[in-house]
A protein has these predicted regions:
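An amphipathic, aromatic/His-enriched active-site/gating alpha helix that lines ligand/cofactor pockets
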Residues: 27, 31-39, 56-84
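Short, surface-exposed ligand-recognition loops at beta-strand->loop->(often short) alpha-helix junctions
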Residues: 10-22
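Hydrophobic aliphatic residue packing
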Residues: 5, 21, 29-32
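Basic/polar N-terminal segments that are highly enriched at the extreme N-terminus
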Residues: 1-2
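Noncatalytic linker/hinge segments flanking ATPase motor cores
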Residues: 17, 47-54, 80-84
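Short, well-ordered beta-strand segments in beta-rich or mixed alpha/beta enzyme
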Residues: 5-11, 39-67
Length: 84
């Protein structure tokens, strides 16, 4: 059995896009927390200009499956024009 995988992703929205980025991430979180192998998928407002997503996955395989999933594809599409 492999060790859990921990990740942090930092999101810096374009000017005026903070709340749209936060909403897109919150929508994704609602889907991702129920994915197999997801231990933690939590959003934090690090500053008024930066959001941090903290993830923990049971295994490399679970993370890889998540990375190819529809929730990540939808999130990437939603964020494509909103990030600095």
């Amino acid at each position: 059995m492999s060790a859990p995988i921990d990740l942090q992703a930092t999101f810096i929205p374009n000017d005026g896009e903070f709340f749209r980025v936060k909403l897109a991430l919150e929508i994704a979180i609602d889907e991702v927390v129920n994915e197999p192998g997801c231990i933690r998928y939590e959003l934090t407002e690090a500053t008024e200009e930066k959001l941090v997503l903290t993830e923990r996955w049971e295994s490399e395989e679970a993370l890889e499956k998540h990375s190819k999933g529809i929730a990540v594809q939808d999130l990437n599409e939603s964020l494509s024009a909103l990030l600095a």
